[in-house]
């Protein structure tokens, strides 16, 4: 979907943990991928490692909004973040808080020129 000139993609929770989901959205024109989630402990590697990697390898912003707190026997990890196409990350903590990030279209262009992963793909080799 396009909003104010930005291509937006939407994934839900676990979907962001698969490289091909973000790649498909990037190839379809997404500039930013929005991910509402309720990820539990001990899966901190998702916001700390996978979300920034998905942003960088696809040259998009990824906004990962995770639930935090405890419900029954489950503790949700928080660590919501916005990862940029060059690896910069703004991160929230374990407690509820508002995370605000300004997305810079020129940063997308710079990053896409420096790391042309989408253009350098070789789908003929892997299907």
Predicted feature descriptions by range:
Residues 67-127:
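C-terminal beta-strand edge segments of enzyme domains
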Residues 1-58, 62-64:
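Active-site beta-loop-alpha substructure in enzyme catalytic cores
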């Amino acid at each position: 979907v396009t909003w104010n000139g930005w291509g937006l993609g939407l994934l839900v929770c676990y979907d962001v943990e698969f490289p091909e989901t973000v790649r498909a959205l990037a190839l379809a024109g997404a500039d930013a991928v929005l991910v509402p989630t309720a990820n539990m402990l001990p899966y901190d590697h998702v916001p700390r490692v996978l979300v920034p990697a998905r942003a960088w390898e696809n040259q998009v912003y990824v906004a990962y909004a995770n639930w935090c707190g405890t419900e029954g026997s489950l503790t949700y990890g928080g660590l919501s973040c916005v990862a940029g196409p060059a690896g910069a990350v703004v991160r929230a903590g374990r407690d509820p808080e508002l995370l605000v990030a300004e997305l810079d279209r020129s940063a997308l262009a710079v990053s896409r020129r420096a790391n042309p992963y989408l253009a350098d793909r070789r789908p003929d080799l892997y299907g």
